[in-house]
Amino acid sequence: MEEAINNVLLLLREDSISLETVLWETHYVLLNLHNEQNLRLVVAQLIACGRIWDYWNEHRSEYFAFWVELISRKKVTNNGLPFSSFVKSIVGILEVDASNEILCFRRICLLCVFYKLLSCDHIVNLQYPLKRAVSKALSKQIKTHQFSGFEANFLLQQLFASVDSSASDISFDAFSLLPHLLKWEEIVWSGFINYLDTEHKRDSLPTAVLCHLLLRLSTYQQISIIKRLITLIDKAIPSWKSRSSDSKYNDHQFVKKNFFSIIMVLESLAKSQYRKSNVLAADRSLCEYIILTLFHMEYLFSFVASSWSTLDFVITTCLSRVAQPAKFISETVREAIIDSIQLEGYVDLQKLSGSPVLVTLSFINNWQNLICRRLEKQTVNEKVITLSSTAKEISSLGLSFAEKLISQSDESTLCKHYVYASLYACLFCNLNEGSPKDYLDNDIYVHARCLFLLTKTLNLDSLKSILCSRVRLYYNIEIAYYFTDVLLKWFQPIIRYEFDNALIFYKASISLVSVLAPAAQKQFLSNYLNSIQGFSTETKEDLIFLVSSQIRQMPYQNATSLLSFWLSIVVGRAV
């Protein structure tokens, strides 16, 4: 055995022997050692062996596999030192302060392994005294060590990931190692930054740990983290842009991974806010910082191809808590609208591609939906739609801007986003002010032209959403009905020369019967039937059937009387 010990000590110093041989010999000697002094020699040399640690740093699963097998076999074999003595001896070695930072970190890594393995009942059955000794030693080392970004990331991978490399489970028990979260905040943040800078495309563990840690922090500590995140984004985005466009890297996945990691962090904070019933000033401040973070991430939104429920949840939750949601409508959109109206010409889409147009789109969209839901539930009065001066200015110019923008919709892949941004801004202009005729005669035909142009670019469901959203925002029944009446009359003559687009509009407008007040529903159905007479008999029959189907989907009591009325006027016209 003495010869085997000398041999393995030599192998650990030698660079020419294969790693597989070195690890196998080390494993064998550690398993069969009878003398604690020799055990200390081998472990100390193992800690000092740089090439083994370089390999383990790149292959965490191999690192865990080595120690899992060793401790599992040590528990059941009678060779060498007893199991308890074996663990206590190694822990005693690892407790001693190392001569330099690198060796100190390697000692911490080995303590992490023993901590994880002693937490697994299938490896060690309730070895509480041993685990307590390891936990105490590990806690002391973590408190005093200054972790680099790489070390922090590696530490998180060891402490929070499953011992089984094939499992995706994450255990947060390791947070109990330190009595206060301040040191954890430092380690987790450092590990998260390192994760964003590296090529880990699948393993998002540092992000998950940061999300969990945020839930343990106070609101003011969360704000501090968000401020750091904004600073990080501002510094990192130029290099991420360069990396995505540089032919040497051309790595969109790297940047995409970072974008979704940041959104995960914001989602975690939004969820914590969503669960709160008593919203304080600090909570409102946090929500404003979350919104601000999204604006700073504008470039990254190119990775969102369509509506995303996670992002919608974050935005809606924060908007429901901030004091003035409208102030987040971007200055970029405002300036672009004013320029296009003043020039009375072509809308410069390149100018609109600046920050933060796409984020503004999401905000206005979710804000509109939030107000709709509140109005439906009658939890707020009409004053909720009071806008800031900037938002009012956008709204007053929005219709003309939307018309110009939609007419250019085929000239840019992003134009669909801008169409939505302008239309959702228009949804708030002059709602419910004045008499129906005074209000609508000025703007209704611009609305109609915008909707007509949208029939060329949007699918049926999107058009339904826009129409219904516009009508649902009226609390004045008379104005809501007048709006739909003028729309139907405007589209009626178009049937003769723009059949396809008119048909799409009439199919979409069927959904309006569900959102109108009961007093206006029957009149709307009468107007609808009158306005579709320009279609062929076959097309009219299809539209009549679609109206019947829409009515059947409504609540039973209302649907029964409406369906009876609808059938009576259809039969009456046929006769």
Swiss-Prot record:
Single GO term (MF): protein-macromolecule adaptor activity
GO biological process per UniProt: protein import into peroxisome matrix
Positions of transmembrane segments: none
Entry keywords, A to Z: Cytoplasm, Cytoskeleton
Main location: cytoplasm
Localization terms from the record: Cytoplasm, Cytoskeleton, Microtubule organizing center, Spindle pole body
A single cellular component GO annotation: cytoplasm
Name of the protein: Uncharacterized protein C323.03c
Source organism of this protein record: Schizosaccharomyces pombe (strain 972 / ATCC 24843) (Fission yeast)
Lineage: Eukaryota, Fungi, Dikarya, Ascomycota, Taphrinomycotina
